[in-house]
Every structure is written in structure tokens, then in C-alpha cells.
């Protein structure tokens, strides 16, 4: 069975994704703080606004779990089971829906899809989760007591002010400019893309993983239908149509032979407990 969709679907669902073949080089170009942001957007599918709302209390260092919680709502429970909106108001007198700069950062919709179950972020490969927690030790965090005004958000400037999506996007585009010089063959793919292209990359990697499994004859008996379900859950898509955009694309030879995808594929296959689908958390036999 062919995994190549018809051309009409491809055109209708066209997206601008960061080329996953260059993801590791992007991480190498970044400083530790930028690397953490790129890992959350690229390997977890988070939006910039979601990443920048990470707080000092949303990281489980022991079990290597991360949560991104909407600061304007009490729907997601944070530290000690307290709604994030109430926590910020009571501890810091912050109203993220009204006060600047918080209101300018926003959040959009939560991820994963069933966030009320307090599910942590999903990583498409454990090697990136490991790199994230290794990189955390390289970031010099400014204590809350040294921040004026006081706040708990993780990503800050040297003066303790919150990083903005605009600042992060400028750094990302500077890195893309360097990558274009290093890899002229990727100029077209790198032109005009922003940080959101890393979220798109996540969807493309997951869809490429499905294609790789099908093309290889699924020797490991991986539940192929679960891959799309997991992608929808991880990216927080309420509609399956939003997820289908990534899967309804033509597959090229690099899906089968590409060095990067083979490396990611191998790490996925090696994890026998199937971390990537998280069947207990992400809905075993759950269909849209």
C-alpha cells in the first residue's frame, strides 16, 4: 500500500516545518537557554507562548517530566494541586489575563489534549528529553527574590524580566541565517520560517515515523493507528483534521534512508515500553 497521498491534499495541507535533518545542528548553535526552548518546541510540539509560561515549579527533575500550564486559567492544576491562575494571584499578585508583560505573551490552547488529567509533555524521542534535563544544569537561574517584580517564570533575561516570543523568534531567525550559510541546499526551507516551524517539525517527524514503519513492513508490530492518535494528543489538536495535515504529505527517499530519521527511529524502537505512545496515558484503543 502506498503511503504517498494525492497531490491535492498535499497542496491544501502545505506547512512550513523546520527541516528535521538540521535540528541537532540548531541545538548546537543555541546557548543553553535557547536550547531548552528549541527542545520544548521541536521535540514536544509546544508553541512559543506555552514554552515561555514554564515556571520554576513545572519541572519534575526526579521523574523527568515537564508541564506547560495556562497562567490565565485554573483548569490545569500546578504545584500542590493549585490552579495556576489562583497560584499567580495569591503568591505574586499577577493577573496574566490583564497585567503586562504577561498578557502580551498569551498561551493559546493547552497541551497535551487531555491536560486536565495533568499529563506531562510528550517527547518524540527520549534522547531529547535526556538532553533537556542535562541542559537544565547549564542554565543560571535568577532567584525569585532577585526579580523585580517577583515572578516564577523560568525563561528570563539577565535582569530577571520575562523573555518575550519576539525576542526568542529573533534569536531563532539568526540561527536559521547561520544554518543557511552552512547548508545552502536548505535555503528554500529555511527562508521566512519562525519558531513555530519547530512545532510543525514535530508533526512531520511523527508522520515520517509512521511512514518509516509502513515502508519497513512494520517488523516490530507497532500499532500504526496509535501514532496519529498520539500526535493529536501530544499537539493538543481538538480536531483530527489539524493532525491529518502532517500525515497527508508525500514521502521522499529520506524517509527510508535519511540518517537523522534512522537515528530517531532507532531510539523509538529501542524503547520497548513504548514511551512514545504512552498507551496508558494517551488513550489505548482510543479513536476520534
Where do the language-model regions lie?
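C-terminal secondary-structure termini that scaffold catalytic or DNA-interacting sites
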Residues: 93, 256-288
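The alpha-helix within a helix-turn-helix
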Residues: 41, 52, 232
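Flexible interdomain linker/hinge and immediately adjacent N-terminus
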Residues: 1-22, 158
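Short, flexible/disordered intra-domain loops and linkers
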Residues: 1, 9-13, 78-82, 211-224
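Short, basic (Lys/Arg/His-rich) helix/loop patches that form interaction surfaces
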Residues: 161-162, 169-233
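Basic, Lys/Arg- and aromatic-enriched nucleic-acid-binding interface segment
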Residues: 20-48, 227
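Conserved tyrosine-mediated DNA breakage-rejoining catalytic core shared by Y-recombinases
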Residues: 54-135, 141-144
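Catalytic-site neighborhood detector that most strongly recognizes the C-terminal catalytic loop/helix
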Residues: 222-225, 234-266
Amino acid at each position: 500500500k502506498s503511503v504517498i497521498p494525492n497531490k491535492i491534499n498535499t497542496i491544501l495541507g502545505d506547512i512550513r516545518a523546520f527541516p528535521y535533518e538540521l535540528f541537532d545542528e540548531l541545538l548546537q548553535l543555541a546557548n543553553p537557554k535557547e536550547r531548552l526552548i528549541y527542545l520544548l518546541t521541536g521535540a514536544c510540539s509546544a508553541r512559543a507562548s506555552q514554552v515561555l509560561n514554564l515556571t520554576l515549579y513545572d519541572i519534575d527533575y526526579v521523574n523527568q517530566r515537564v508541564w506547560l500550564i495556562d497562567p490565565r486559567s485554573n483548569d490545569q492544576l500546578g504545584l500542590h494541586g493549585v490552579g495556576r491562575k489562583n497560584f499567580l494571584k495569591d503568591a505574586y499578585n499577577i493577573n496574566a489575563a490583564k497585567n503586562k508583560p504577561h498578557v502580551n505573551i498569551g498561551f493559546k490552547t493547552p497541551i497535551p489534549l487531555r491536560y486536565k488529567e495533568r499529563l506531562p509533555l510528550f517527547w518524540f524521542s527520549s534522547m531529547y528529553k535526556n538532553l533537556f534535563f542535562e541542559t537544565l544544569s547549564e542554565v543560571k537561574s535568577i532567584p525569585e527574590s532577585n526579580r523585580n517584580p517577583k515572578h516564577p517564570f523560568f525563561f528570563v533575561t539577565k535582569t530577571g524580566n520575562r523573555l518575550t516570543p519576539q525576542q526568542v523568534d529573533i534569536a531563532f531567525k539568526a540561527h536559521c541565517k547561520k544554518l543557511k550559510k552552512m547548508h545552502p541546499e536548505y535555503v528554500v526551507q529555511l527562508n521566512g520560517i519562525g519558531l513555530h516551524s519547530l512545532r510543525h517539525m514535530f508533526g512531520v517527524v511523527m508522520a515520517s515515523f509512521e511512514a518509516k514503519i509502513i515502508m519497513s513492513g512494520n517488523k516490530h508490530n507497532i500499532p500504526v493507528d496509535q501514532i496519529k492518535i498520539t500526535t493529536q494528543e501530544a499537539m493538543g489538536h481538538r480536531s483530527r483534521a489539524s493532525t491529518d495535515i502532517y500525515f497527508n504529505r508525500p514521502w521522499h527517499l529520506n524517509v527510508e534512508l535519511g540518517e537523522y530519521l534512522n537515528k530517531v527511529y532507532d531510539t523509538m524502537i529501542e524503547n520497548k515500553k513504548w514511551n512514545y505512545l504512552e498507551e496508558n496515558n494517551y488513550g489505548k484503543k482510543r479513536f476520534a
